[in-house]
Amino acid sequence: MSKHSRRVFVVTLSFVMSLAGLARASDKYKIAGAEVVVVCPLTVGGSFEAKTKNVDGEIASGADQPGSIGGALRVDLQTLETGIEIRDHHMRDNYLEVQKGPDFAFATIEQLRVEKLDGKTTFKGILALHGQRKEISGTANLQPQNGKVRVDAQFPIKVSEFQIPKPTYLGVGVRDEIQVKVSLVAVPAASQIAGNQQ
């Protein structure tokens, strides 16, 4: 290879690597708004919902494995509300046991893997809850728009698998399998936006 060809190759390689770095960086997102809804079916029929909007985290497309998503989502279980104050206290203190520390006060979803990054898809991940870590799987709809990504996801969990005491309220129990719904909007990380403007 001639000196000129080597120079062209080095310049071209540097340019491609720079573009790749920007692409990876632009795939970093922070959570701009989110809501988690836990649907709890009752043993006697019907259900109630526990909700919170206290969700934060940062996610990014995994560079090492296609379909993987780095980062994590963290949900503040201390802010879950069902609409009945005494039931909220029972749920947080007697069952989720949020007073035991961060591993109980927060739930974390991490190591996400999706079939595709646009449209309806399936996903798997790890849920850290009540001091336990278990694999989860569910469905999601990802909608990129104007630089943002809206995500609506749903997955089931079994309360007993996380060693949570069997929930009862006024003699009525909650079924072992409950549904978790997550809706969020992710935007490019603020640090990355600032970096691009420099």
Describe each region flagged by the PLM:
Residues 3-4, 18, 22-26:
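Extreme N-terminus of proteins, especially the signal/transit-peptide cleavage junction
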